[in-house]
Amino acid sequence: MELIFDTYGLFKHFKQPNGNISDVNAAGFTGALLDLRSACPPRYFMHMTRSRNEAAAEGDIFLPDEPDRIGETVKPFLDACRGFDMQVKGAIAPVIPLDRSNPAMNDYQRALSFASVRCAMEAGCEWCIVPPLFVGIPLEEERIVNIKFYKSFFPILKEFFEKHPDEEFKILLQNQCRDRGGHLVRGILSDADEAVEWLKELNEESGKVLGREVFGFCLNIGHVNICGQDLDEITLVLGDYIDAVVLTDNNGSEDSEMLPFTCASRGAGAVAASADTDWLSVIRGLRNIHYDGPVILAMSDTLRTFPVFIRPQLLSFAKTVADFFVWQLTLEQTIAKYSHVVLFGAGNMCRSFMMDYGEKYKPLFTCDNNQSRWGEEFCGLRIESPQKLMDLPDDTGIFICNEYYTEIREQLESMGVKSSIEYFSDRYPNTLARKRLKGLWKNV
């Protein structure tokens, strides 16, 4: 699974990106998104005249007027990424704010989208996210207008494939929100069935014209949350059409981009806050389709609110959060890579492992530090002494099913256990409702 950091929010107009890219690289990220919102931010379209004058005063290129100069704008960013061996495999075109109503905005978006796709191709990207047109378009005409819009990329794509027949490039559609009097509701392509219909029609046509399918889908988790949708259902419909996932957080009502797990609310009468995003649905939904494509960590609003002096520490923590998601999403792949599996722990987490993966990847046994339980059977497994881990078959993975991960790992390493040690967590189980067992730690 490829982890990509979205640098939007780190710098203005891609100016002096070296220090910021250095921090991103030092945090452990190896891939960056060419987010063209940095070159042409949404605020440009809210106050066009003022933004145009400000850009002129600062010597910046005002891309809505000169979209073909986008390559000049992004060059410092691309040079910095190359300097730090940061891969840039994907891009996203500029977006128009959802509250705009002047249909002339669509002309700007068309020109900027074409320029963005060309820029992404020249930068060596494999795909570019191109949001649909929406400003002032009646609901009944949205599909007709946008199918025509996406087909208009065929000449650019044909030219690219003629020059680079062995390379791949895709245009990714993305689920959107819609502004209704200041409230965000479900927008274009938020319905998974509708998205699949669009993709089938577009790819059928691209197959005829280009000899290959060139359209895919980028699933934005933040938009799913705002629309109040269940990712379990969406992913099953979209399936293999999903070529990228934007991992971000928000409060469920505003289209912000926050670091995952940082948005939480306490409802009336609640004793503790709960996450504003249904992370169980997110993780389970992507696991269900064995998603293994690019994950884009988008946290532009978190980046903007943190002082620059502690940004390196923020980026390091962001990498930890991103790694957690990759671990959760690829849990089954981790289990499957071993010929044999053994568990450490004989409680709720062990039971969770057996409910989710026990039938497909039956462990040899489990073990526990509680001597009084040795020889007991739990969830179809015999509970053994940790000492038995010293004599395991080759290619065995030991999965710690206990929240005291660090202590148990240190215990096993001090014993001289040679097998690989992995972690398991039941925080986001595949199996639905389950009652936790109690009293398993007691001597009986």
Language-model regions, residue ranges each:
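A short helix->loop->beta-strand "cap" motif at the edges of active sites that frequently abuts
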Residues: 84-86, 125-126, 167-169, 289-293, ...
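Alpha-helix N-cap and loop-to-helix initiation/capping positions
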Residues: 49-50, 61-72, 104-112, 138-152, ...
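Histidine-acidic metal/acid-base catalytic patches
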Residues: 1-7, 14-28, 118, 124, ...
